[in-house]
């Protein structure tokens, strides 16, 4: 519909609605009707599309946190009149600035129809219902609810910041979150770990909008809670992250005690240290020690030291620590290893034949013991428990039983208990007894059974006697703990007494018991025979001891024939090396002969039938320990001295083996290594004519064969060049030459280095020495000095 049509319609409608003017009415009567018609026209005009006033945006429900800004929208179309806001039905005023409400104002463009209500710094009082009204258009928006959220004003735990508690006493931790809207939610934390089980309640304030939340958490404080932190977190929609407050616990508790032993396992009598380690809040006031429930008067510290016995295994040692809150007592037993100790003693038992008997014996020991029951004089184990059960006993079961306890590697103990079985007397004397002819003799009759005999009588030949004297015979009765002894004493025993049988009969309430005893003669050795045997045994013992001493002496003497080295640090050797090609006959002897005795035999083989080499070459060895203690005045330094007298040394001299002629062969090599001292002793002889060796040097001291004043030093090294000399006293032998060539006697000229005829089988014996087996003797003309350290 166009505007022209719309105007035409309006005019038509208006004319149709107006009453027709009667011709007889005046103009004043038509005036009210014109006003009504006008209003109807305006209303219809506004109702038509494109021309009516309406809300394009109305306020909606909102939530705002106290202190924040809130805007309620209101937008009108086709309206240019007055707009106002109401709060819970109360008009706030007109215009943009609402002077009565400083935090309120209408914002937006009026040309655009925007009449928004802005609230700054929202408060609890702003929590209401709001409405936008177009007064001239008689329009009202929907009601919008503005909800103001208020966080808890304060969160507090009662009793903080430090709460003093008693260990073991339950306590409720209480947290309060005040004046929150909506009511706050409370969560508990213990050292950062969320706790469950809290009980929560709320209280509504007088304004009817805010609430206070109360939460209680039940705890059981212990000494481990000292310093523990509990946190209360309160939150609502106004503060999602919440507010927190914390408290710390201070728990008073009696001492917490740990009792230790060092060492933990001990033997009886050893020392033990008890240590009482304790923690307490408040501080410890003192210590008390007790053993087996009895106070130890002189122990007041945290350590107690004592020597333990077996009682510490069964009687605990206790340590009591106390403070203002209370005291704590801790006890412990000591693992004491001890020998068996009896707890229940076995009791002697008397019973009748056919009864059952139980013997009891209780021991204690540590480590666990082994218990055995045996009968005296028997090794058969009858039981391994504390009790020995004997069923249907007879008189044969009577006797002494042994209860033995064994603690491995610690000790053994035992107790004996007798068992008496009532019955007729049992005589336990020997059936054959002895006496000496002419002396006083005794025949004994012992009854160890129970009950004791009422009567004991002796009968022999035609004689009968219970007690008293009859001619040479006397009967006596003696009571002891083990039984009754009746003794028949015979004065001046005769031959007829050995031909008689003696009847001993005893009676008690259970009947009689009889034994037949034979008396036999005991032969006595004369005193002279006994004395002679004793003396002979003593003499034999003396001779045996002397033989043993002599044997040990000879054995020790024989063991001193070895040669020992007194100095082990330095040795000097002078070794000649000869080509084996010059003396082919020496090859077989190089490794087979190495002792001093064989060397002497090689040199003096012609005298071996007349001289006892074993005696002449006796070596007196000084013990190794003494040799080590001897000191070298040169501190191990060795000298090789030429053209000087040979120093006095412990050497075997060979003067007895040489003929005292002007020219003699000296069997000793020029280089001598003392195998007793370890020092090198070298004498260098010049290559002089044969006359230079006309006499033998006088020995430095007497040297008898087998002498004990020196230690023989037998050095048989290959020696240096000597002049040739005929062997004294043996003209028939070929000339014996060693070493470098010398001027030969007439008729024996040879070229230099020409081989000479050997003397006998052992011509190469002088090549052997006490040097190492690996020494090289293959080169004749190469001389070397060896130093061994």
Swiss-Prot record:
<feature type="domain" description="Ig-like C2-type 5">
    <location>
        <begin position="424"/>
        <end position="520"/>
    </location>
</feature>
<feature type="disulfide bond">
    <location>
        <begin position="445"/>
        <end position="504"/>
    </location>
</feature>
<feature type="modified residue" description="Phosphotyrosine; by FYN">
    <location>
        <position position="638"/>
    </location>
</feature>
<dbReference type="GO" id="GO:0031253">
    <property type="term" value="C:cell projection membrane"/>
</dbReference>
<dbReference type="GO" id="GO:0048471">
    <property type="term" value="C:perinuclear region of cytoplasm"/>
</dbReference>
<feature type="glycosylation site" description="N-linked (GlcNAc...) asparagine">
    <location>
        <position position="5"/>
    </location>
</feature>
<feature type="glycosylation site" description="N-linked (GlcNAc...) asparagine">
    <location>
        <position position="503"/>
    </location>
</feature>
<dbReference type="InterPro" id="IPR003599">
    <property type="entry name" value="Ig_sub"/>
</dbReference>
<keyword id="KW-0393">Immunoglobulin domain</keyword>
<dbReference type="InterPro" id="IPR007110">
    <property type="entry name" value="Ig-like_dom"/>
</dbReference>
<feature type="domain" description="Ig-like C2-type 1">
    <location>
        <begin position="49"/>
        <end position="147"/>
    </location>
</feature>
<dbReference type="GO" id="GO:0043198">
    <property type="term" value="C:dendritic shaft"/>
</dbReference>
<keyword id="KW-0597">Phosphoprotein</keyword>
<keyword id="KW-1015">Disulfide bond</keyword>
<dbReference type="InterPro" id="IPR013783">
    <property type="entry name" value="Ig-like_fold"/>
</dbReference>
<feature type="topological domain" description="Cytoplasmic">
    <location>
        <begin position="553"/>
        <end position="789"/>
    </location>
</feature>
<dbReference type="GO" id="GO:0005886">
    <property type="term" value="C:plasma membrane"/>
</dbReference>
<feature type="topological domain" description="Extracellular">
    <location>
        <begin position="48"/>
        <end position="531"/>
    </location>
</feature>
<protein>
    <recommendedName>
        <fullName>Kin of IRRE-like protein 1</fullName>
    </recommendedName>
</protein>
<dbReference type="Pfam" id="PF08205">
    <property type="entry name" value="C2-set_2"/>
</dbReference>
<feature type="transmembrane region" description="Helical">
    <location>
        <begin position="532"/>
        <end position="552"/>
    </location>
</feature>
<feature type="disulfide bond">
    <location>
        <begin position="74"/>
        <end position="132"/>
    </location>
</feature>
<keyword id="KW-0325">Glycoprotein</keyword>
<feature type="compositionally biased region" description="Low complexity">
    <location>
        <begin position="694"/>
        <end position="712"/>
    </location>
</feature>
<dbReference type="GO" id="GO:0017022">
    <property type="term" value="F:myosin binding"/>
</dbReference>
<feature type="modified residue" description="Phosphotyrosine">
    <location>
        <position position="654"/>
    </location>
</feature>
<feature type="modified residue" description="Phosphotyrosine">
    <location>
        <position position="657"/>
    </location>
</feature>
<dbReference type="Pfam" id="PF07679">
    <property type="entry name" value="I-set"/>
</dbReference>
<dbReference type="GO" id="GO:0045121">
    <property type="term" value="C:membrane raft"/>
</dbReference>
<dbReference type="InterPro" id="IPR003598">
    <property type="entry name" value="Ig_sub2"/>
</dbReference>
<dbReference type="GO" id="GO:0045217">
    <property type="term" value="P:cell-cell junction maintenance"/>
</dbReference>
<keyword id="KW-1133">Transmembrane helix</keyword>
<comment type="subunit">
    <text>Interacts with TJP1/ZO-1 and with NPHS2/podocin (via the C-terminus). Interacts with NPHS1/nephrin (via the Ig-like domains); this interaction is dependent on KIRREL1 glycosylation. Homodimer (via the Ig-like domains). Interacts when tyrosine-phosphorylated with GRB2.</text>
</comment>
<keyword id="KW-0812">Transmembrane</keyword>
<dbReference type="GO" id="GO:0097017">
    <property type="term" value="P:renal protein absorption"/>
</dbReference>
<feature type="domain" description="Ig-like C2-type 3">
    <location>
        <begin position="255"/>
        <end position="335"/>
    </location>
</feature>
<feature type="disulfide bond">
    <location>
        <begin position="276"/>
        <end position="319"/>
    </location>
</feature>
<dbReference type="GO" id="GO:0050839">
    <property type="term" value="F:cell adhesion molecule binding"/>
</dbReference>
<keyword id="KW-1003">Cell membrane</keyword>
<feature type="region of interest" description="Disordered">
    <location>
        <begin position="687"/>
        <end position="713"/>
    </location>
</feature>
<feature type="glycosylation site" description="N-linked (GlcNAc...) asparagine">
    <location>
        <position position="78"/>
    </location>
</feature>
<keyword id="KW-0732">Signal</keyword>
């Amino acid at each position: 519909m166009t505007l022209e049509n719309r105007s035409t319609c309006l005019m038509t409608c208006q004319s149709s609605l107006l009453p027709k003017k009667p011709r007889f009415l005046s103009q004043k009567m038509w005036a009210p009707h014109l006003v009504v018609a006008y209003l109807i026209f305006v209303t219809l005009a506004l109702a038509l599309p494109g021309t009516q006033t309406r809300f394009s945006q109305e306020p909606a429900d909102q939530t705002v946190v106290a202190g924040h800004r809130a805007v309620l929208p209101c937008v009108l179309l086709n309206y240019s009149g007055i707009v106002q806001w109401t709060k819970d039905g109360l008009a706030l005023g007109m215009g943009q600035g609402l002077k009565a409400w400083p935090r309120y104002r209408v914002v937006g463009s009026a040309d655009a129809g925007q009449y928004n209500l802005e609230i700054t710094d929202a408060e609890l009082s702003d929590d209401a219902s709001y409405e936008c009204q177009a007064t001239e258009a008689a329009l009202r928006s929907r009601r919008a609810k503005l909800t103001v959220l208020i966080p808890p004003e304060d969160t507090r735990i009662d009793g903080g910041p430090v709460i003093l508690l008693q260990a073991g006493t339950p306590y409720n931790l209480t947290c309060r979150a005040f004046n929150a809207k909506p009511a706050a939610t409370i969560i508990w934390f213990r050292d950062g770990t969320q706790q469950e089980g809290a009980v929560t309640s709320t209280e509504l304030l007088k304004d009817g909008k805010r609430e206070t939340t109360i939460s209680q958490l039940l705890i059981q404080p212990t000494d481990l809670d000292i310093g523990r932190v509990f946190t209360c977190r309160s939150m609502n929609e106004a503060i999602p992250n919440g507010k927190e407050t914390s408290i710390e616990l201070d728990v008073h508790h009696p001492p917490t005690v740990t009792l230790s032993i060092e060492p933990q396992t001990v033997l009886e009598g050893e020392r033990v240290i008890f240590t009482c380690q304790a923690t307490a809040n408040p501080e410890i006031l003192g210590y008390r020690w007790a053993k087996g429930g009895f106070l130890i008067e002189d122990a007041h510290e945290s350590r107690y030291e004592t020597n333990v016995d077996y009682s510490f295994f069964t009687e605990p040692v206790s340590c009591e620590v106390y403070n203002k809150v209370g005291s704590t007592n801790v006890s412990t037993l000591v693992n004491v290893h001890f020998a068996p100790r009896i707890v229940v003693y076995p009791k002697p038992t008397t019973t009748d034949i056919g009864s059952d008997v139980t013997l009891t014996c209780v021991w204690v020991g540590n480590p666990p013991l082994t218990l055995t029951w045996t009968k005296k004089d028997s090794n058969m184990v009858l039981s391994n428990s504390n009790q020995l059960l004997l069923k249907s006993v007879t008189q044969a079961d009577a006797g002494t039983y042994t209860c033995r306890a064994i603690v491995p590697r610690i000790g053994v103990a035992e107790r004996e208990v007798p068992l008496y079985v009532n019955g007729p007397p049992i005589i336990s004397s020997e059936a054959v007894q002895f006496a000496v002819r002419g002396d006083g003799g005794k025949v004994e009759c012992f009854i160890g059974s129970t009950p004791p005999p009422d009567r004991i009588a002796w009968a022999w030949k035609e004689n009968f006697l219970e007690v008293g004297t009859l001619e040479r015979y006397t009967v006596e009765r003696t009571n002891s703990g083990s039984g009754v002894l009746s003794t028949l004493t015979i004065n001046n025993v005769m031959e007829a007494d050995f031909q008689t049988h003696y009847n001993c009969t005893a009676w008690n309430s259970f009947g009689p018991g009889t034994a037949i005893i034979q008396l036999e003669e005991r032969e006595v050795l004369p005193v002279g025979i006994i004395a002679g045997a004793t003396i002979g045994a003593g003499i034999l013992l003396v001779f045996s001891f002397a033989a043993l001493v002599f044997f040990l002496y000879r054995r020790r003497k024989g063991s001193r024939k070895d040669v020992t080295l007194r100095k082990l640090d330095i040795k000097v050797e002078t070794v000649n090396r000869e080509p084996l090609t010059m003396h082919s006959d020496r090859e077989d002897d190089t490794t087979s002969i190495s002792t001093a005795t064989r060397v002497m035999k090689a040199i003096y083989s012609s005298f071996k039938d007349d001289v006892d080499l074993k005696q002449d070459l006796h070596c007196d060895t000084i013990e190794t320990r003494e040799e080590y203690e001897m000191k070298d005045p040169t501190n191990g330094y060795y000298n090789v001295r030429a053209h000087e007298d040979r120093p006095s040394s412990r050497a075997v001299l060979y003067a007895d083996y040489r003929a005292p002629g002007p020219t003699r062969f000296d069997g000793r090599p020029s280089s001598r290594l003392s195998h007793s001292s370890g020092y090198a002793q070298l004498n260098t002889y010049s290559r002089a004519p044969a006359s230079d060796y006309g006499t033998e040097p006088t020995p430095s001291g007497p040297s008898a064969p087998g002498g004990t004043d020196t230690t023989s030093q037998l050095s048989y090294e290959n020696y240096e060049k000597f002049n040739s000399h005929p062997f004294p006293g043996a003209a028939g032998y070929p000339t014996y030459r060693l070493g470098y060539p010398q001027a030969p006697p007439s008729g024996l000229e040879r070229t230099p280095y020409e081989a000479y005829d050997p003397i006998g089988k052992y011509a190469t014996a002088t090549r052997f020495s006490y040097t190492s087996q690996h020494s090289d003797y293959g080169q004749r003309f190469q001389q070397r000095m060896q130093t061994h350290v």
